[in-house]
Amino acid sequence: ILFYSLSRYYDLSDYGLSSGFRDWQLIAYNFIHLTFMHMFFNSIGYLIYKPVIAEYYGRKAPIIVIPISVILSSAIFCSEKPTFGASTIIFSMIGMYLSKIWQDGHSKRQKYTIMLLIILIMQSIFGYNVINWKIHISALAISFILSRLCTTFTMISRSKIS
């Protein structure tokens, strides 16, 4: 909220992620929202996925997976225009969630996959030329893969202990 409030009075575009970025911008851009709706929808996504991710993975995996997926996707797919907002964090959480659904083989898998596709289609319609698609999709994919690796290594280490 602080960064959103500041963006109402000061130009924070230098803090967004763009080509020629400084290292600290790989994290900072996630905390700057330029509109209330942007902040609102990211907050809703966070509130929806955080308890589910914590239940599925505990506290350690998200602390590892989310920063890695956010930093990797932003370093690889930054663009000429500055990128802002926590959507990359939300898409990382969605990737972790989809990984767990995939692993468990839920019958809900199709339902949630369709919901995710609707979100992506809505973004492409309403956010065309504004939203950095590549960062979102890569954060989702990277967090999905890292989550699968975390659960695989956790299962391997548990089987060796017992």
Region annotations inferred by a language model:
Residues 1-162:
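A detector for small-residue-rich transmembrane helices and their helix-helix packing motifs
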